[in-house]
């Protein structure tokens, strides 16, 4: 673990994060997350907007799920859950994993628009 309070975080970065305790179907615990916040916010804010990743293949037909795969430093095939976006303090980010490429982030942005009804 290292101090992520002062590192430059970019949209598309993947980290392990401690999402702590949650309620019901919310994603919790230490898990990979994908940064979806814009880089201006990432530069100046003490918080960061993320979407959790999961390796559990459930309800894959949802338009808010994006297959990431076993790439970008991830050790298992992973899916971004864009219906589970949340803001976390950047100190919850534990370890840098990698950075998603542009085609993946384009699919993430499209799923985010669906999730937020911005289409």
Tell what function each PLM region has.
Residues 1-119:
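Conserved functional hotspots at enzyme active or ligand-binding sites that engage polyanionic ligands
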């Amino acid at each position: 673990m290292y101090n992520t309070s002062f590192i430059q975080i970019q949209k598309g970065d993947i980290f392990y994060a401690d999402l702590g305790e949650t309620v019901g179907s919310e994603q919790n615990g230490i898990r990979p997350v994908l940064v979806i916040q814009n880089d201006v916010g990432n530069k100046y804010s003490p918080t960061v907007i993320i979407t959790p990743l999961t390796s559990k293949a459930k309800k894959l037909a949802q338009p808010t799920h994006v297959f990431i795969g076993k790439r970008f430093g991830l050790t298992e095939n992973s899916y971004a859950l864009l219906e589970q976006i949340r803001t976390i303090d950047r100190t919850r980010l534990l370890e840098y994993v990698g950075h998603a490429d542009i085609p993946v982030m384009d699919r993430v942005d499209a799923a985010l628009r669906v999730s937020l009804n911005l289409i």
